[in-house]
Amino acid sequence: MKKDDYLVEIRNVLKQNPFILVGVSDIEGEEICRFLKKEKIEFESVKLSNESPYWEEIPAEIKEKVNNIILSGRKVMSLCIGGNMPEAIFSIAAAWHAGPDEDKPYSPIEQLSLAIKKDISPYYRLIGANSRGFIYAMREEAAAMLKGFGARSKYKSILKDAGITDYDLEDYKQKVYDSGEAGMERIPETYRAGIGLVIREIRRKDRAAQGITQEQELQAERAVMKSYLIGSVTVVDMHDAKPAAVFDRLVETEKYGLLMLSANGGSYFLGPWSKVKKFEEHFPEGKVGGEPPIRGHWSGNYSRPLVVDFVESLEKVKDKSKLHEKSELFMKL
């Protein structure tokens, strides 16, 4: 389906005064709720875990309510909820694109904004980029936006929508910001500090929306300090830390590969799309997403030795005495 046809379909559903259910498991779900409130569109939200934002996890009373609404003949739209839901529900669950002709997939908030406003605000473009590819994708989106005519007005719009004040920006420049921060070189220097702060805030709010506590942030810092290398891939034994809290502190590793291993048997890999495809081929029951053909992420429940052995073979490691060299790409948040 072409983009214009798909957006017309969303608009047609919205014209029918649907019951809208928003799954909130991250910052995008929260921003969609704010957007709908601003547009004075009625909706109901349900809190879901970031690890399992699926229909199957929705409380029974809400499912019953939705089913009764469907039986009454009223249209139902769901946002940011995956899984096997009733076919009658019009679902905007994840990134959508029309194939190779599209520059990039649209996240749910971008789809909704295009359907209602016929445009995507600069801030929502960053939120969408965060959903597609986290920090790297946001940097690239900002670099693309802040060029040529209109760049300054877009920059001001981003700061305003992110809730960044002049005081916040000056404080950030004095205490934290380094103009030579890796990965920000493509963003014009005039806007670099402000965008750096906005990206940091989006990731902080995203982790908070996922339910990551201060104690889990500290757990992530401790785990990251013990990270090591298998070839060019950085490996972190997360124990009970959360993947987002670990990744945000090791973002520069994504260009080579980051493997996160949790205590409950979950494995998470982020890195170049070529390596993600290798994971997908070797572990077909895992889940894959991201921004092909540039970068992506894979996750699955496989034994630690199995995953580590695969990474060793992927990296063609022969001298295992150097497997535990420390990674130096730690970023203090």
Regions found by a protein language model. Give the residues of each.
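Short His-Asn-centered micro-motif
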Residues: 22-25, 78-82, 96-98, 130
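Short, acidic/turn-prone active-site loops that include or flank metal/cofactor-
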Residues: 48-51, 98-102, 286-294
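Short acidic, S/G/P-rich loop/turn micro-motifs used as interaction or catalytic elements
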Residues: 25-28, 51-53, 83-85, 101, ...
